[in-house]
Regions:
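Short low-complexity stretches enriched in small and charged residues
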Residues: 6-10, 37, 77-79, 116-120, ...
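Signal peptide-directed extracytoplasmic domains
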Residues: 23-186
Length: 332
């Protein structure tokens, strides 16, 4: 029995050594690249498993799971830096890992998240040490003039995405690029919009998209949420959407939306004023732009959260009140 256990342990050790040897061999083999040089962008706050997937998706012939094993085995799993990397023919998994651990980026990245406010975007850009901060201390209106935009209020006008830049680049160029990207995406979506929508301009559609962005709990519900608000606009009903009220409260909002807040009139209070608010309330992504301009075919006028991130939609107030009692108050 003891002899059998010794053989079993020896076999297990041999298997581990063989696997380790296989990883070491693989780590030194050149990988295939879809182009050379190949620019690969690793997003900020990526896990080691996500880095392997981003490499593979970018056209690097690595096995994501093996790359993760290699990173952990070499103690580099938590040392990989975000940014743009230039990979050339002959690169191996080990050389790529070393490059990322040392942060040998050709470009740096700033990621702007869907649903952020302009204030949040400016805070992240201002905190990026690799940028030249030419807009620091500027008012929003001055920033818009600096990038050559005709608008004075920047809210919603910058496309949320991951942007590459070289060290020492001016933040003016980043803002200009994000602004131009939003203009292009918005105009492209406007050109493909559904018929008979209650928007007079692309800017109104952008405002609606920002509301959809803030109201959406599950991605698949965007077009239904858009349908509710579009239907209410058509009927001249109050939109009654909490995110606009919160935006209108500004710095005075403490995280708890009260009844008196819903009754306090501001230009953004859609419980007291009909129509859309005067500006967007956030930076909407492409999916929200498309939903605003191509809402689902539905007669729904109401929705309420089910408490799990999804929503219950209703076409009349009676059904809506029943849904509110069920999902918000726990009543049958």
């Amino acid at each position: 029995m003891f002899s059998f256990l010794k053989r079993l342990i020896l076999l297990a050790i041999l298997i581990v050594l063989a696997a380790a040897g296989g990883v070491v061999w693989w780590a030194q083999q050149p990988v295939s690249l879809s182009a050379s040089p190949l620019e690969v962008v690793i997003k900020p706050n990526s896990s080691v498993s996500s880095v392997g997937k981003q490499l593979a998706n970018a056209g690097v012939g690595v096995q994501p799971q093996l790359f993760s094993v290699l990173a952990r085995a070499t103690g580099n799993a938590k040392s990989l830096k975000a940014g743009g990397y230039a990979l050339e023919t002959g690169a191996t998994p080990m050389s790529i890992l070393d490059k990322m651990a040392r942060g040998e980026v050709t470009h740096y990245v700033v990621t702007v998240i869907e649903g952020w406010s302009m204030r949040q975007m400016r805070a992240v850009v201002d905190a990026e040490p690799a940028l030249k901060h030419d807009t620091a201390g500027m008012s929003d209106a001055d920033l818009m003039r600096k990038i050559g935009a005709p608008e004075t209020n920047p809210e919603g006008l910058f496309f949320p995405d991951t942007y590459l830049f070289a060290r020492g680049s001016s933040d003016v160029e980043l803002y200009r690029h994000a602004y131009q990207t939003m203009q292009k995406r918005l105009n492209d979506a406007w050109a493909k919009r559904s018929l008979d929508l209650p928007y007079k301009t692309p800017y109104e559609a952008l405002t609606m998209a920002s509301i959809i962005e803030k109201e959406t709990g599950q991605k698949l519900e965007r077009s239904m949420i858009a349908a509710v608000f579009v239907n209410r606009l058509r009927k001249n009903m109050l939109l009654q959407t909490d995110p606009t009220v919160i935006y209108g409260l500004g710095a005075s909002f403490d995280g708890n939306l009260r009844k008196r807040d819903l009754q306090t009139d501001t230009p953004y209070n859609t419980y007291t004023r009909t129509g859309l608010p005067p500006t967007p309330i956030a930076l909407p992504g492409m999916a929200s732009l498309q939903a605003a301009l191509n809402p689902a075919p539905s007669d729904a006028l109401y929705f309420v959260s089910r408490g799990d991130g999804s929503s219950q939609f209703s076409t009349n107030l009676t059904d809506h009140n029943r849904a509110v009692n069920k999902y918000q108050r726990g009543q049958p």
